[in-house]
């Protein structure tokens, strides 16, 4: 059984409010306006495992919360059930009182956290696109 591909026209609209930069991350260390959640492994977050990219220091952004993206995924690659996702976020003290932004090593797996957050909260996720690949250069 093959699916028929139907041509369509899609107009993408850029929304810069869903992306933050390094300056905003640094400001947040002081003003704590949003929770910054890191999708990397716990060992990388804690600086116990070297970064795969040469030239990056180990560690994490001050005041950020570690939530390895793998915790949200079943063995078959699907997301865990909504109630499980909520429980995991709650266990990590990620709440709805503050806005959220997500980062990872390169800006890719942070979107897994962002989508999971969107599923459980109905809010659009905000991503630090530079992620640790940018932040870890300092």
Please place each PLM-identified region on the residue numbering.
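Rhodanese-like catalytic fold shared by cysteine-dependent sulfurtransferases
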Residues: 1-35, 39-138
């Amino acid at each position: 059984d093959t699916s028929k591909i139907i041509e369509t026209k899609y107009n993408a609209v850029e929304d810069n409010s869903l992306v933050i930069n390094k300056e905003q991350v640094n400001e947040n260390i002081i003003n704590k306006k949003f929770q910054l959640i890191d999708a990397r492994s716990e060992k990388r977050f804690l600086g116990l495992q070297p970064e795969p990219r040469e030239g990056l220091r180990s560690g994490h952004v001050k005041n950020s919360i570690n939530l390895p993206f793998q915790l949200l995924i079943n063995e078959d690659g699907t997301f865990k059930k909504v109630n499980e996702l909520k429980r995991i976020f709650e266990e990590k003290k990620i709440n709805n009182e503050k806005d959220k932004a997500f980062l990872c090593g390169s800006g890719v797996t942070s979107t897994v956290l962002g989508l999971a957050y969107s599923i459980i909260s109905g809010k659009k996720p905000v991503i630090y696109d530079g992620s640790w690949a940018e932040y870890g250069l300092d």
